[in-house]
Swiss-Prot record:
Keywords: Cell projection, Coiled coil, Cytoplasm, Membrane, Phosphoprotein
Tissue: Nervous tissue.
Family designation: Belongs to the stathmin family.
Gene giving rise to this polypeptide: stmn2-a
Coiled coil (residue ranges): 75-178
Topology term for the membrane: Peripheral membrane protein
Record Pfam families: Stathmin (PF00836)
UniProt-listed GO biological process terms: cellular response to nerve growth factor stimulus; microtubule depolymerization; negative regulation of microtubule polymerization; neuron projection development; positive regulation of neuron projection development; regulation of microtubule polymerization or depolymerization
Ranges of residues in domain SLD: 38-178
Localization per record: Cytoplasm; Membrane; Cell projection, Lamellipodium
GO molecular function: tubulin binding
Name used for this protein in its record: Stathmin-2-A
Cellular component annotations (GO), alphabetically ordered: cytoplasm; growth cone; lamellipodium; membrane; neuron projection; neuronal cell body
Species of provenance: Xenopus laevis
Length: 178
């Protein structure tokens, strides 16, 4: 019971004075379920916790309503043969101009492709030439190092032969003197 009284007090705070007085005269709330406009009618179907549902009814056009207006097409003037020929010549000039522009764009594109290809070939040739020069320098360096190594090896061999000859000579002298 206490909960009901508290809820009633809260409800009374929410309601305006006018609503309170009206609720005294009309115990049931006023229910407006239909709204009418010129060419449509809106009916409230039901209220739910998730929202409200409405039905929209469109009225058929009344027979008294205005007939749809037809737009009058602009009056055509007589076109002479000279004007037609001038228009055809202008169209031909536009077509030729467009073709010339397209051909110019294609020529520029081809020229650009040619330049790119030429640059790529140049870079490839430069790379090949530089790689070949590096390889030649490396081979020359290897050849010089090998020649130096062989020369030092021959020098050591000659030194050993001289030493061996000197040892033999000393040995022979020892045998002859001894």
């Amino acid at each position: 019971m206490a909960k009901t009284a508290i809820a009633y007090k809260e409800k009374m705070k929410e309601l305006s004075m006018l609503s309170l007085i009206c609720s005294c005269f009309y115990p049931e709330p006023r229910n407006i379920t239909a709204y009418t406009y010129d060419d449509m009618e809106i009916k409230q179907l039901n209220k739910r916790a998730s929202g409200q549902a409405f039905e929209l009814i469109l009225k058929p056009p009344s027979p008294v309503s205005e007939a749809p207006r037809t737009l009058a097409s602009p009056k055509k003037k007589d076109v002479s043969l000279g004007e037609i020929q001038a228009k055809l010549e202008a169209a031909e000039d536009r077509r030729k101009s467009q073709e010339a522009q397209i051909l110019k764009q294609l020529a520029e594109k081809r020229e650009h492709e040619r330049e790119v290809l030429q640059k790529a070939l140049e870079e490839n040739n430069n790379f090949s030439r530089m790689a070949e020069e590096k390889l030649i320098l490396k081979m020359e360096q290897i050849k010089e190092n090998r020649e130096y190594y062989l020369a030092s090896l021959m020098e050591r061999l000659k030194e050993k032969e001289r030493h061996a000859a000197e040892v033999r000579r000393n040995k022979e002298q020892l045998e002859l003197s001894g």
